[in-house]
Amino acid sequence: MSKFNRREPTYSDLVDGLLAAITDSMSYALSIGEALLKTNTRPALKPVCIHLLHPPKDILSVELGHLEESLKAKFYELTNMFPFNKGFEIVLISSDTSVDWSKALPAPFMKTQLNNSLPLGQKSLYVSAWQGTYAHYIKYVCQIEGYAQPDLVVAFQPNFAKSPHKLMMDWTDDLKIILTNSFACLFTFSDKDEKQKAFNVLDAFQTHFVSVQSNQFSSLMLKQLPQKPNCVYAKSSFCIVIRGFKRDSESSANKYLNSELTLGRTSFYKMKNICVLF
């Protein structure tokens, strides 16, 4: 026993600690890989483009000069999950002005019409970044300049279900782009209540759910939330995978998005199914 009267760690404690650290590091990549399988995306047939929206702080917890190397290490397991892949590009998209993305990461390079000059190949992983809103990126960078649209959009621990203000500020336009273009999208959550709130919000948009479940690739590193000191949570414990609108309500959902979200965002609060959440 130590002089502080603490129990010395056993071999089992060391194994549990090692597993917690490894799963915490690999959870993001494995969660993306599972979402690619659920959405029938086949990396063996063509290069895969992944858009990562509003990157979480733990991904960016290194100096800018080492960010690209750190991100490649975090997501490299994707290339092992799909050993015959044609290459991956992960594009970090954020409107956060506190980070100068032009100095931290290269600009996106994968275009719709790939050419032989692009350094994509088997088991290759490239990380790039773009600063600005997602709506602007899709409309101008993808649709006009010809850069690749996403095979999968990813948001780790999104906070759009925590407050109406945060939802309106960060996610209304993003959800409109994702749903109207029928992009496959993965959301992960640390808390069951947050996952349920997000499900109710997305369901109010007549979203087509591919999967809503516990994440088998969640982190095993347990943490506490300041607002819930008696509870513990693990990163990416739950996941939701969506793609477009429900087939039987696609036209009405598009009509709603075009009128309510674009012309009058304040009317968002009139939706009964969402208002009761907050």
Language-model segment annotations:
Residues T172, K176, T180-F278:
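C-terminal functional extensions of proteins
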